[in-house]
């Protein structure tokens, strides 16, 4: 009897394992070698690419019948070089258009599966939407979303940010029409899931600083902020830009004095702006880093300039340990840290439109307010 029971238990375990395997979600990221090969496949399957290929048929006939090859050559070069650009633009627009027509289904999937900002929570949404869009002929392949991150990004740019920026009900109805109640429900579910993730991050996943006594701020190491800045930008990664800058200086020598001063000057200012904002790729890409930054600000007991110095010191160590930055010199000092928070976080609360190349981080708005209030309250208590 016992042997039969053991056999039955083993058979049940095998069946359950097979059921789990059959229920395993297969995404395009599991089928393609990389996002680039997936992207090339989607372009190949698009209508715009086929039209571009068909354009070569009349061009080849024109080449054969024309006595003057100059005009066919010019048109062929235009089709060759401008054609791929138009194909990419049209594919991007058709992708947004296809999803905008299925916002209700998109929001229903989010409401049913309750994903948070964790990419793994979006895998079910990706699988369901890929199948739905293909079966309803809204997209010509089963690979609309490459992975969970791609789906979450589209949710932010298509639903979360545009809807959150609308100030009143009339503006929302005008832009989203019948999708408004579904979007509101989906956003409420998403906000609830993100709040749970925030609380879980505080209790289990947050980083605790250890051995900060030996951590020095760059202001204590370098003679000035200029030397720290120059050390950061004179790297192998910036070599192409510096070569372009030197080329700009050489070329401008053949022009008038005003142009020789203006051209290199503007180019150098552009480089300074670029390097000043290059840190955004380290801190603003991963949600985990942004949450840790806000949590560090909220939990800091020290007030005023000393408090921001401590926050800068902790974040310098954190980003170095997480390999998000190559050294412990991400922030120069507390003033630099406060500027970064004000420029890339607090300013989002009053944003009227999406910022260029930067996410609005709508789900972080309550915690950004909390971080700002915590610094203001500590400064008031000190007074």
Curated annotation (Swiss-Prot):
Protein family: Belongs to the DUP/COS family.
InterPro entries according to UniProt: DUP/COS
GO cellular component terms, semicolon-separated: endosome; fungal-type vacuole; membrane; mitochondrion
Keyword DNA-binding: no
Spans within the Extracellular topological domain: 64-72, 254
Record keywords: Membrane, Transmembrane, Transmembrane helix
UniProt protein name: Protein COS7
Molecular function per GO: cargo receptor activity
Listed transmembrane segments: 43-63, 73-93, 233-253, 255-275
Membrane topology of this protein: Multi-pass membrane protein
Any Pfam family the entry gives: DUP
Species this chain originates from: Saccharomyces cerevisiae (strain ATCC 204508 / S288c) (Baker's yeast)
Biological processes, Gene Ontology terms: protein transport to vacuole involved in ubiquitin-dependent protein catabolic process via the multivesicular body sorting pathway
């Amino acid at each position: 009897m016992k042997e039969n029971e053991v056999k039955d238990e083993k058979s049940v375990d095998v069946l359950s394992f097979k059921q789990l395997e059959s229920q395993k979600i297969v995404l395009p990221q599991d089928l393609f070698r990389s996002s680039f090969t997936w992207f090339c496949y989607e372009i190949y399957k698009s209508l715009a690419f086929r039209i571009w290929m068909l354009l070569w048929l009349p061009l080849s006939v024109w080449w054969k019948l024309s006595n003057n090859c100059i005009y066919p050559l010019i048109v062929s070069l235009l089709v060759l070089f401008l054609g791929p650009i138009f194909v990419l633009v049209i594919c991007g627009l058709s992708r947004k258009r296809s999803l905008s027509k299925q916002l209700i289904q998109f929001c229903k999937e989010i409401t049913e599966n309750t994903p948070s900002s964790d990419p793994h929570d979006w895998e079910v949404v990706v699988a369901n939407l890929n199948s739905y869009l293909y079966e309803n002929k809204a997209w010509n392949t089963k690979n609309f979303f490459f992975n969970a991150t791609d789906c979450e990004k589209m949710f932010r740019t298509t639903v979360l940010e545009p809807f959150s920026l609308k100030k009143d009900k009339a503006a929302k109805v005008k832009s989203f029409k019948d999708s408004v109640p579904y979007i509101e429900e989906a956003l409420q579910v998403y906000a609830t899931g993100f709040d749970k993730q925030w609380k879980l991050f505080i209790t289990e996943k947050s980083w605790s600083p250890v051995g900060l006594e030996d951590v020095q701020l760059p202001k204590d190491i370098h003679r000035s902020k200029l030397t720290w800045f120059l050390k950061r930008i004179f790297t192998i990664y910036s070599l192409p830009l510096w070569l372009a800058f030197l080329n700009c200086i050489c070329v401008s020598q053949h022009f008038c004095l005003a142009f020789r001063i203006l051209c290199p000057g503007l180019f150098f200012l552009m480089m300074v702006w670029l390097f000043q904002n290059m840190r955004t790729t380290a801190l603003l890409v991963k949600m985990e880093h942004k949450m840790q930054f806000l949590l560090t600000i909220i939990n800091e007991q020290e007030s005023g300039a000393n408090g921001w110095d401590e926050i800068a010191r902790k974040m310098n160590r954190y980003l170095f340990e997480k390999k998000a930055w190559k050294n412990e010199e991400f922030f120069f000092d507390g003033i630099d840290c406060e500027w970064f928070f004000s420029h890339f976080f607090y300013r989002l609360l009053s944003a009227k439109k999406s910022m260029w190349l930067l996410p609005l981080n709508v789900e972080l708005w309550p915690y950004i307010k909390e971080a700002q209030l915590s610094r203001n309250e500590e400064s008031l208590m000190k007074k």
